[in-house]
Amino acid sequence: MGRAAKRTPGYRVQNRKHKRKPCKDCVAQGLPLTRDAKYPGPRCATHHREFKAARSSTSWETRILATYGITAEEYWAIYEFQGGRCYICQRANGKRKRLSVDHDHKTGIVRGLLCTMCNKYILGWARDCIEMLQRAIDYLRKPPAVQVIGERIAPIEADKLRSQT
């Protein structure tokens, strides 16, 4: 007799059918009781996803009201006013992850909606210093290296530039 035959069933092999309950939302809606609630939750997978999304939305609305003093309707009005995109980069649209509410840390005034990258790494890193951001614009428009050594293409970019032409 092999080792497997002598082994008693472990906890992973238990029959949990007796512990399953019908989904409470399916029962409330009068749906046929074919979908079991996953142990230990009271809802089937479909209703669990719906409940989780609703709870997430409600907690988000509560958080932006408490943190920034704006309602969900005001958030979406700003979103529409900005064209449904991050105001700085115009790339992020908030479909996968909602845009962040940006505010001035000195005055507390809500300024608009930005993606995480722009809010955290552009404005956050610059600490809202207009002079620093202006220097960055000047740097991009008139690079100091071009003024000193002239336009010189970096070897790591040369192959890419040749293949594009």
Curated annotation (Swiss-Prot):
InterPro entries for the chain: Endonuclease_7, Endonuclease_7_sf, His-Me_finger_sf
A Pfam family per the record: Endonuclease_7
Coiled-coil residue spans: none
Entry superkingdom: Viruses
Gene3D superfamilies linked: His-Me finger endonucleases
Protein name: Gene 59 protein
Highest classification ranks of the organism: Viruses, Duplodnaviria, Heunggongvirae, Uroviricota, Caudoviricetes
Gene name for this UniProt entry: 59
